[in-house]
Structure formats: structure tokens, C-alpha cells
Amino acid sequence: MVEDILAPGLRVVFCGINPGLSSAGTGFPFAHPANRFWKVIYQAGFTDHQLKPQEAQHLLDYRCGVTKLVDRPTVQANEISKQELHAGGRKLIEKIEDYQPQALAILGKQAYEQGFSQRGAQWGKQTLSIGSTQIWVLPNPSGLSRVSLEKLVEAYRELDQALVVRGR
């Protein structure tokens, strides 16, 4: 089981779709060696060095958190049903209402659209929010994603810089 890493007052909560088998096996988020999450958040400016999956709790030192839409681990995210994503979206809203981070970063357009019953999502900040929490849609850093490392870092850096501008 991969536990959420959440606390009140975070700058951002990164929300993956669901744990992969590597994460489920280790108990650490984004644990597969091909997953670029840890490299991307470092290069985008969220951390001052590249954390390892087993150091995930240190995200809180940077006022960052991690959660997921669906708890069930799978090999690929496309094994998750629309119903599971929609139910996960409802639970995610409750978590975000409880913790009230400055931003929620959903990692993947399909996850956002199905989890929040939205259509035609674009990358970046969304018009939808949860209270005062901004919702952002960022490319998924999975090794299965075709998005280049450069584009991932650019998208994540945009969020980091927007939070700095807000004084957070």
C-alpha cells in the first residue's frame, strides 16, 4: 500500500493516477526506475536536490505532498475504470478540502477529465478550483509517457513559479 503524504499548509499536492506495481511493492510513490517524477520536481524547482522514492516523506520539508486518484495498483493506468476514477475524484475533493493546499496538480489530462467529469482539459491551471486550491493539470511523468523530460520540467516549473508569484 502506498500511503498519502499530506499535511495542512502545503504549496502543492501532486496527484498520480494510481500506484504502479513497483510502488505497490516498495510502498513508495513513483518508485519505478523509469518514472521521472523525482527528477522532474527537482529540475522544476520544487526540491533543492533529487529525492529518491524512499525519501518521499521529505517532500513535506518542501511543503509538497503526494496522493492518488485510485488506490488499486496496476501495470498500466489504462487498467483503471472510469467508475474508479470518478469515485477517486470524489474522495480526492474531500482530501483537498481537509488539507487545503495552495495547488493540486493532477498528473494527466485523462485522470483530470474522468476524475472530475470535465472535458477538453488543457495543460496548466484550470478554471475549476476546490475552495481556494488551484487545480493544475500536468503531464504524467511515467516512463510510459511520450512527453519529453524537457517538456515535463517546463510544465512543472510553470506551476512552481506561479506559486512563488502568489507568495507561497
Curated annotation (Swiss-Prot):
Function summary: Excises ethenocytosine and uracil, which can arise by alkylation or deamination of cytosine, respectively, from the corresponding mispairs with guanine in ds-DNA. It is capable of hydrolyzing the carbon-nitrogen bond between the sugar-phosphate backbone of the DNA and the mispaired base. The complementary strand guanine functions in substrate recognition. Required for DNA damage lesion repair in stationary-phase cells.
Source organism, top-level taxon: Bacteria
Keyword Transport recorded: no
InterPro entries membership: MUG/TDG, MUG_bact, Uracil-DNA_glycosylase-like, Uracil-DNA_glycosylase-like_sf
Known EC number: 3.2.2.28
Subcellular location: Cytoplasm
Family: Belongs to the uracil-DNA glycosylase (UDG) superfamily. TDG/mug family.
Gene from which this protein is expressed: mug
Protein name: G/U mismatch-specific DNA glycosylase
Entries under Gene3D superfamilies matching the protein: Uracil-DNA glycosylase-like domain
Classification of source organism: Bacteria, Pseudomonadati, Pseudomonadota, Gammaproteobacteria, Enterobacterales
Entry GO CC: cytoplasm
GO BP terms in the entry: base-excision repair, AP site formation
Subunit structure comment from the entry: Binds DNA as a monomer.
One Pfam family cited in the UniProt record for this chain: UDG
Main EC class the enzyme belongs to: hydrolase
Intrachain S-S bonds: none
Transmembrane intervals: none
Recorded catalytic activity of this chain's protein: Specifically hydrolyzes mismatched double-stranded DNA and polynucleotides, releasing free uracil
Keywords: Cytoplasm, DNA damage, DNA excision, DNA repair, DNA-binding, Hydrolase
GO molecular function terms noted in the UniProt entry: DNA binding; pyrimidine-specific mismatch base pair DNA N-glycosylase activity; uracil DNA N-glycosylase activity
